Amino acid sequence: SDFICPHPEETTAYIVYLLGHMEKIAAVLGKSEDEKLYKKYAERAKLGYQKLVGTKKFSLDTDRQAKLVRPLYMRLLTEKQTTYAKNRLIKALDNYGWRLGTGFLSTPFILYVLEEMDTEFAYRLLENEQMPGWLFMPKTGADTVWESWEGPKAQGGVASLDHYSK
């Protein structure tokens, strides 16, 4: 929702991510000065991100899967932070019964992150038939992606039944 202000952790992560893409675009276009500038900005923002998640308020010690998946996928962390975030993600998944707990922005990343860690982790999440999860929908009769994990009954039948993919 546009009315919800993003958190500094999310905003900084996407700034680094987008600056990295801008750096690549500048390289393709042969704009070496712009490429250097975007790289410099991305490196500084990445350091800022690493400091931010080192604080208590934005700590990686969380069960919020998105907060762990995002920096792992975007490669925003130090080596020590990466090891911690991977271990913490597995703990978060264990705590949530290996059910999906990411939102729109991080769901596309989670299987890539898990597959890189161990293919079995990715399959374990993907093949979980409990709600919330990808296989819960077809198991309960869906042939499209629902807006709500619970399906049409969750909102009296008015929820989108052909929603942005989760």
Give the ranges of each region predicted by the language model:
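Active-site core of glycosidic bond-cleaving carbohydrate-active enzymes
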Residues: 1-166
